[in-house]
């Protein structure tokens, strides 16, 4: 538990540093951004075994935490916040990097959906985090990035899952 809190705090620290104008030059390097995306963001967006156990044991609690935002101190929420910060400050650079990882995640899912469903879950988190530009607790997301075709992503990736006859098999 302490380790997870440390990861969450480290991700929050990176978000704060990325927002500061005097440190932005560090994050403008494409190699650094790619390393942060690959080695920090993606692993912490993954739906982990502990997440699955909480969902299986108490789905209402899992959903409540997610909707209410009481998962604020989790590594997954901190990774989402880091994605939002990076995409708001380095949108064009980050779009290409995350686009490649999104393609990798969705390809992995398509290879074996029953086994690789976590890849699609991570992809969805990545897209929603990247697309978010502003919002409120009451209304949710109120502004989105123009670079992210959310209706198209939803039509191609979300709706088919919801329309699947056995949609509770995975995802």
Region roles according to the model:
Residues 2-160:
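Alpha-helical repeat/alpha-solenoid scaffolds of the HEAT/ARM/MIF4G superfamily
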